[in-house]
């Protein structure tokens, strides 16, 4: 019952919800520059000092060193490869009790040093969401 009480019912039925809340992805750098380095990255949540998120795509066959100024959690959405020393892959099916290689936490020290992401696929990109907590120094609120 508590959860039902905290829902904003008016916002959930707002016919103009998208117009009021949609955030167009914002590239972190020039797409031409990052694509030449084998990756693309965009801010997808960037209006709150309390949390933010980016979508990172590492192109097929590319190896990219990705640097951030803050720790983050990562969820893999597509592809397989390596992230630092770890194998990463997107599971097609998860059964109860099975471990997966699609969620990781990156410490601030590792993020600042840079995380090497290797995509061995000839056809599929690696796509991941990176979510940050409060006070991300890379975030420019707009």
Stretch-by-stretch model annotation:
Residues 50-51, 58-101:
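Glycine- and acidic-residue-biased ligand/ion/polar-headgroup-sensing regions
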Residues 1-20, 119-142:
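Double-stranded beta-helix
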Residues 17, 22, 43, 51, ...:
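Phenylalanine-focused residue identity feature
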Residues 86, 97-138:
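Ligand-binding loop in jelly-roll beta-barrel domains
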Residues 55, 93, 114-116:
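Well-ordered beta-strand positions in beta-sheet-rich domains
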Residues 1-71:
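C-terminal amphipathic alpha-helical segment
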């Amino acid at each position: 019952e508590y959860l039902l009480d905290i829902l904003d019912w008016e916002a959930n039925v707002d016919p103009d919800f998208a117009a009021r809340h949609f955030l167009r992805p914002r590239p972190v750098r020039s797409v031409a520059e990052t694509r030449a380095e084998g990756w693309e990255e965009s801010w997808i949540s960037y209006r709150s000092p309390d949390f933010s998120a980016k979508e990172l795509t590492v192109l097929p066959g590319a190896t990219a060193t990705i640097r951030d100024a803050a720790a983050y959690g990562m969820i893999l959405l597509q592809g397989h490869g390596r992230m630092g020393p770890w194998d990463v892959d997107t599971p097609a099916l998860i059964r109860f009790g099975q471990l997966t290689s699609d969620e990781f936490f990156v410490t601030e020290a590792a993020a600042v040093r840079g995380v090497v992401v290797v995509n061995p696929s000839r056809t599929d990109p690696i796509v991941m969401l990176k979510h940050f907590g409060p006070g991300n120094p890379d975030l420019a609120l707009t």
